[in-house]
A protein has these predicted regions:
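Extracellular/periplasmic solute-recognition and catalytic clefts
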Residues: 1-18, 41
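A structural preference for short, hydrophobic beta-strand core positions in alpha/beta folds
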Residues: 3, 161, 190-192
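Extracytoplasmic
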Residues: 7-9, 50, 156, 267
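Append "and occasionally in soluble cytosolic enzymes with long acidic Gly/Pro-rich linkers
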Residues: 22-178
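Short helix-initiation/N-cap motifs at beta->coil->alpha
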Residues: 167, 190-200
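Short phosphate-binding/catalytic loops that engage adenosine nucleotides
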Residues: 186
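Detector for C-terminal structural segments
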Residues: 29-63, 169-178, 202-306
């Protein structure tokens, strides 16, 4: 028998020293290209719950209504086309996003919810298109970019993916990610590293994408993980400071809601989900552990040999 006790989160870390990964369009292309559901199913054997932010999905601060950047190769290819334009503007590589994303609502959403969401997004996209039309006079729309131009952009790009070779689940996830990125024309190389090699690579930033994870704190707090992502941004710092200085529960909830939306819009990292670890009990033992995030062994005094 087993009892779930410890919550861990796994995610993809971007190296922001890489000029390509500093570009929002490239990061969004990668985010849309990765099939996270496949990772949960095939790499983690469904032993995880898909989440979009480093908080337990049962936390009062987790925004279950926020639509993620779900697997969508059409969106991924569109963002690669947009990257051709944004990367060529050396003096104006602003993180402005006006690409018309296709619906990527979670499967759990009802058809009615999908229609309502799409109507709202389409209205917003039309406003963005009008706003972007002035800039288009100076150049082209992303829809005008050809596949050959995208190939030329990616010709010399190979992203190094590092993963701890002793974590079989993440190794499988790295393979899925590599295949997903290759499918949209992004070349990759996977480096399976020992524990000490992984630590050195992270410290020296000798990677482009890193598959890592950590235990979630007992108290719902995503600030530590967000700070470790290496995304240097004044607005993000503002949200994190607001969380630390919040004086009420409502203020914390509101700030977390805004922060989660911002992290998604900027594609700051890619979350796989929350993994369950277990305490395993021999069948000869009678009783039940009632462990929680604070005490893995809570209730062990009630366990007896049959």
């Amino acid at each position: 028998m087993w009892t779930p006790c410890i919550r861990k989160t796994s995610y993809v870390l971007f190296n922001y020293d890489n000029e390509y990964l500093k570009n929002l369009d490239i990061r969004k292309a990668i985010s849309f290209a990765i099939d996270r559901n496949s990772i949960i199913k095939d790499a983690y054997s469904n032993r995880a719950k898909l989440t979009n932010f480093p908080l337990n999905s049962t936390s009062v601060y987790y925004d279950n209504e926020l639509k993620p950047l779900s697997y969508n190769t059409e969106n991924a290819n569109n963002y690669l086309k947009k990257a051709v334009l944004s990367l060529s503007k050396t003096d104006d590589n602003k993180e402005k996003d006006t690409t018309d994303d296709k619906d990527n609502t979670d499967e759990e959403k009802t058809e009615a919810d999908d229609k309502a969401t799409n109507n709202k997004e389409n209205t917003s996209d039309k406003k963005d298109d009008k706003k972007d039309s002035k800039d288009s006079k100076k150049g082209r729309y992303f829809k005008d970019i050809t596949n050959s131009e995208v190939r030329a952009l990616l010709k010399d790009v190979t992203f190094k993916i590092i993963v701890n070779k002793n974590n079989s689940e993440r190794v499988k996830a790295a393979t899925i990610i590599s295949n997903n990125l290759e499918a949209i024309g992004i070349k990759t190389e996977i480096k399976d590293l020992e524990d000490d090699e992984m630590t050195k690579a992270l410290d020296k930033k000798d990677y482009d994408l890193a598959l890592i994870g950590c235990e979630l704190p007992a108290v719902s707090d995503a600030t530590y993980i967000i700070k470790q992502l290496g995304y240097d941004d004044k607005q993000l710092d503002k949200y994190l400071n607001a969380l630390q200085n919040a004086n009420s529960e409502d203020e914390i909830k509101s700030t977390y809601k805004t922060l989660q939306k911002y992290v998604k819009e900027k594609a700051i990292f890619i979350s796989f989900g929350i993994l369950d670890d277990y305490v395993v009990l021999n069948g000869r033992l009678d009783g039940e552990l009632i462990c929680n995030d604070f005490n893995v062994y809570r209730g062990i005094n009630t366990i007896k040999i049959k």
